[in-house]
């Protein structure tokens, strides 16, 4: 490795620590300069290769960074190839210095890929992987990969790679076109033998943005990445995406495949979950629409949001190769107050599973001014234990099923009636605790583009929850249709309890309470009840209690 000068990082006789401020200084300096697009130094044989050939280039694990050191984490590297045609700079940070990890073609086996060794000796790496013994103590497995733009993917114990996170999104789904900032340089702290975390710094650059990022990786059953970011804009943007997630949804029970397929579902994520600042929980099943769809959910100070994979049984996917049931959900937990803004969901048409077509991010209402730094911090959970990120005291949506709407005739034959039916199963411990004859009812709202022809709720003994059947007749098929539903029930209003005088002894307090209760009873018999008191028929006053998260679905246009 080549040593890099540490000007300004330490003074004589003093210890120093590389930190986010060092990367932010670089980002600030870059922001004041004209953007320079990265230059590719990749020979045509690598740039024009097909994916199958790119896969033949194999990194030699025995030559991983820190392979001979007693560190819990190791690094392996991606070779350039295909559209990964621009090198990134990768540095190692130790207690005393920063050194660049130089490209070495001897770390790779090229198979039958024809190439001239002279043209590869100064190429540089396209990205890197983090290795850690997450599944077996004697086996280094990939737990994080950083490759392309500002993308990174992470897994926990027993997971397989699925959706991705990004550093920043700019003007996503706008007619002007999206700008993809990229991580151009990394600094990785060399871990100590007993360390359970790995710290990675990254420098971000794009035509209209620069930024400094600190990613603290903590592997486990759920792997966590703590993200600190400090970003500068070179110029104004129209839409800013903070904590962006990118995933894939091809089809599933709420939008079955149009082509006969043995798989019941094919997706990396099935829904967007939002925990709003006001405490509301919302669940939005994903679609693969025929036209670009953008949904904005206004939220102030979000408590969390994420793209989730709730179905965890092999039978939900039936795919022995891709194991969608093992692909993690990603949950964003903001640190601090993020203010007013929206969680935005972008759904893009795709014909196959090779294209990521789902994007979700936080979009601040007030956009930062160019040149002024803005900071966001959040914890990113990669999990297959979704109930941990659902309201413990509310039921949630177990599944959404779509079907052709029909009516059962007198001869018991079902006759389609031109409607579309949605069956929504609400489940969870909060609902299972209720008796099956509990007076649970649905609370629904449907946009102007549809007429509700059935709203039926019944107990589901298989889930110990309730199944909502909602049938709609769409008015204009070329328009999308919004709908929402939640389950509620009436519960008695608890009478207000009088405050006790702290100076009274226990006996006096007990006597005063009893005396007051008698007077209250006499008064209740003599006086007319107030508007919010118990009804005159003797029934208890009630209030409506929300039992579940809100199911929010958009039926795409032209379906």
From Swiss-Prot:
GO terms for cellular component: outer membrane-bounded periplasmic space. One of its GO terms (molecular function) is catalytic activity. It is found in: Periplasm. Its main location: periplasm. Residues 1-17 form the signal peptide. Pfam families: MdoG. Residues 492-542 are annotated as: Disordered. InterPro entries: Gal_mutarotase_sf_dom (IPR011013), GH-type_carb-bd (IPR014718), Glucan_biosyn_MdoG/MdoD (IPR014438), Glucan_biosyn_MdoG_C (IPR007444), Ig-like_fold (IPR013783), Ig_E-set (IPR014756), MdoG_OpgG (IPR023704). Pathway: Glycan metabolism; osmoregulated periplasmic glucan (OPG) biosynthesis. Residues 525-534 have a biased composition (Low complexity). GO terms for biological process: beta-glucan biosynthetic process. Residues 500-524 have a biased composition (Basic and acidic residues). PANTHER family: GLUCANS BIOSYNTHESIS PROTEIN, GLUCANS BIOSYNTHESIS PROTEIN G. Involved in the biosynthesis of osmoregulated periplasmic glucans (OPGs). This is Glucans biosynthesis protein G. The gene is opgG.
